[in-house]
Every structure is written in structure tokens, then in C-alpha cells.
A protein has these predicted regions:
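Alpha-helix boundary/capping motif
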Residues: 2-7, 12, 21, 25-28
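Short, Lys/Arg-enriched N-terminal segments with co-localized hydrophobic residues
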Residues: 29-33
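An alpha-helical support segment within catalytic cores of ATP-dependent transferases
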Residues: 38-49, 153-228, 240, 280
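Conserved N-terminal boundary motif of the eukaryotic protein kinase catalytic domain
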Residues: 50-59
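Short acidic/polar mixed-charge low-complexity motifs
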Residues: 51, 74-78, 244
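ATP-binding pocket architecture of kinase catalytic cores
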Residues: 58-183
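Active-site Asp-x-Gly
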Residues: 177, 181-186, 195, 224-227, ...
Length: 290
């Protein structure tokens, strides 16, 4: 059924949550609740999933880059993300999620399954598995991340970097592959970041000093080349109803596994048991804190 006729509105009104008023026109509270999720987009989603209409749509707060909703059909709940910036943020996220899922042990770590991706007139829509989050300890989260790093490291392409242009937040992540960690870290991450600041304090001489300092610090470092989440702060991780770790909103690349551990130290960090379980798989090396 095309989501453009009055019977569709009536049918939804009869079955959606009572908290949502019955729609009378397309400017009713029901569609205000959809926050610019257009009827054309809803119709495209339904056709992609082989569904006739959503049972309910509820806006989800928390992100500052995308709009998001929980969308429920008769037999499933999905998380819908929508972006209008025309920069392929969600296409990159889809790619990262699909690649990370190849290396997880599902007994300990969950990564949302990608259900569908659509680009409708430069508006991106990503549908992924909805996961109810709970407050458990972080043992399985730490163990699951360690297992992901270990399995990906065992089958990695022997190159550092990533084959597609990416993002961390709204910041571009340069694509490319290097055969060693120092060149990757400098050429694909540090130098592009410094150049993007366009500040006089980062002139050519200063950038060269930064390069030499990083080279000297990493010269004797022997990294584990793993597929990392890439943006693993506490807001992008949690636990499901079974106590399994959950990670989402990735900015993946092939990198030193310590990239993820360093990121977990931001904004309050993770719990003690997370690090204990992770370091059972990857023991702490000299210089980790540095």
C-alpha cells in the first residue's frame, strides 16, 4: 500500500500508541512527532521491508548529527536514523557495522544488524536492529571487544587505514592504506587534523616537529593491527538485557588496537571490570598509558 491515502492514516490511528493523537491532516501531531520524516520516506521504508505501514514511530533523543526514531512494525522494532547533510555519514556507518560484525563473538558482544540503507533525494536513511539497553557490569563488553580485536587481527589485510572515506562525528576521516602504523597515524589522521585547523600555530615547521616527535615515540612500538570501533567512548557502548556488551555508532579503521582503549578513557571512562577482561586477552604493554 502506498503511504499517501486517508485509509492509511485511519489504520495507523487505530493501532498506534494511544499517546499519539489520531491524525486528521498531514500536519497533525502524529506527523509532527515524525519530525520531518516524510510520507515518501516512510513509503520507501515500507516497500524495502515488505511492510504495509508502521505500527508506531517514536522519536529518540540524544544525537546531534542525525534525527532518530524507534519504528515498530507488527513483528519487529527497528532503529531509524536520518541525515540530510548529503555527506554519506550513514552509508559509512552501515559499512562499519557490517564489517565489525564479521569478527564478533555473539556470546559476549552485540553490534546492531543493518536492515536497510536508503538514499532518497540525498536524504540518508539507515535502519538497524533495535536493542534495549540495560545497566549490567561491563565484563562481557571488555571481553567481547578483546575478541573482536583478536579475531580481526588474525585475518587483517596487513595494512593500516581504511579503503573508504569516513567520519568521526562530523569530522572527515581520510581514506587510504599504509603498510606501517607510523605512516598511517601521521598521514591519515594527525596531519590532516592539523591542516584542517587552518591556524598559524600549525605552520609547516610546527607540523614537521610534531611528525618527528610522533615517529620517535612510536619507533619501537609493535602495534596489533585490528579493526577498531574508532569512536569508543561511553556514549557509544552499553549492555543488552542479557548482559552482553553492545557497541554502536562506529568510525572504524584498521589501526593499533590501543586506539579503542585510549578512546574509552574519554568522558569518564569505562568500569574497572571492562579493562580487566580486555587485558586478559591483550595484556598491558609497557608504554600503554603514554
Amino acid at each position: 500500500m502506498k503511504v499517501t491515502d486517508k485509509p492509511f492514516f485511519d489504520k495507523i490511528a487505530a493501532e498506534v500508541s494511544p499517546a499519539i493523537p489520531a491524525p486528521t491532516t498531514i500536519t497533525s501531531d502524529f506527523f509532527i512527532k515524525m519530525q520531518k520524516l516524510s510520507l515518501i520516506e516512510i513509503n520507501e521504508i515500507c516497500e524495502e521491508l515488505g511492510e504495509t505501514y508502521p505500527k508506531s514511530i517514536e522519536e529518540v533523543q540524544g544525537g546531534d548529527i542525525h534525527n532518530a526514531w524507534r519504528i515498530e512494525f507488527s513483528n519487529k522494532k527497528l532503529f531509524l536514523k536520518r541525515n540530510i547533510r548529503n555527506k554519506k555519514f550513514l552509508e559509512f556507518e552501515k559499512y562499519c557495522l557490517q564489517n565489525l560484525r564479521k569478527y564478533i563473538n555473539q556470546e559476549n558482544l552485540v553490534i546492531p544488524e543493518v536492515i536497510a540503507y536508503k538514499n532518497i533525494k540525498n536524504i540518508e536513511i539507515l535502519l538497524i536492529e533495535w536493542i534495549d539497553m540495560h545497566n549490567f557490569d561491563q565484563k562481557k563488553l571488555g571481553k567481547g571487544l578483546g575478541e573482536l580485536h583478536l579475531k580481526s587481527a588474525e585475518s587483517n589485510p596487513k595494512m593500516f587505514g581504511f579503503p573508504v572515506e569516513g567520519f568521526i562525528g562530523t569530522t572527515d576521516q581520510k581514506k587510504g592504506l599504509e603498510d606501517n602504523w607510523i605512516d598511517c597515524f601521521l598521514n591519515l589522521r594527525i596531519i590532516p587534523q592539523l591542516l584542517s585547523l587552518k591556524s598559524r600555530i600549525f605552520d609547516k615547521e610546527t607540523i614537521n616537529k610534531v611528525k618527528e616527535k610522533i615517529k620517535s615515540e612510536l619507533l619501537n612500538h609493535k602495534p596489533i593491527n585490528a579493526l577498531v570501533h574508532g569512536d569508543l567512548w561511553s556514549g557509544n557502548a552499553g549492555m543488552d538485557k542479557n548482559g552482553k556488551g553492545v557497541i554502536f555508532d562506529p568510525a572504524s579503521w584498521w589501526a593499533d588496537n590501543e586506539v579503542d582503549i585510549a578512546m574509552t578513557k574519554l568522558f569518564g571512562g569505562f568500569r574497572k571490570e571492562f579493562y580487566e577482561e580486555y587485558h586478559k586477552i591483550f595484556p598491558i604493554k609497557n608504554g600503554l598509558k603514554k
